[in-house]
Amino acid sequence: MLFRSAEAAGVDAIVAEGFEAGGHNGREETTTLCLIPAVRAVTSLPLIAAGGIATGEAILAMRALGAEGVQVGTRFALTEESSASEVFKEYCLHLKEGDTRLLLKKLSPVRLARGNFQQAVAAAEAVGATEEDLRILLSKGRAKRGIFEGDLEEGELEIGQASALLNEKGIQTVAEVMDELVTGYHRACETLAANVCERWDV
């Protein structure tokens, strides 16, 4: 694992990101749920979980798996303060489960939302596109066009699977998101303490 090299180099903490995350990703398709305990088992460094984390409940789950903290991307990418296009934000807030896919594994794996570009990449890969073919497909500033200019037709729409959890949220401020995450985390802690542990006689 790459984290071993990072640990040897003297880093202060490790960020372990599951393939639920938006944007560039690992080729292994390891979920955050499986990745965090695997990394926790072999390092004593502070561990920051990432990928698919958009609620307070998810934060508690990561803590239970051994992470000291979390990295949240999709939630904050869709806030008022984000520099992403408003068109991109609104589009992502209407995505459903299964609307994002991990593609471009021959180059640099990236999770993309449904749209013309995602379809074009999937079609190219299905017929055996070479690395050079894929580079040509990517060579038109696609990410900037999609995320920052709001080009939903030809742009690269990078966002995580957690977007499907945000359909009823609308565009929120960072403060509102933080309040929800903290409140949700504490509520989940209380629920776990009051119900699960007692029910399972732990």
Give the residues covered by each predicted segment.
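Short, small-residue-biased leader/transition segments that mark boundaries at the very start
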Residues: 1-2
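Acidic (Asp/Glu)-rich catalytic clusters
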Residues: 7-10
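Non-cysteine beta-strand/loop elements that form the S-adenosyl-L-methionine
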Residues: 12-18
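Short, ordered loop/turn segments at secondary-structure junctions
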Residues: 18-20, 75
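Conserved active-site-proximal phosphate/metal-binding subdomains
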Residues: 26-48, 54-202
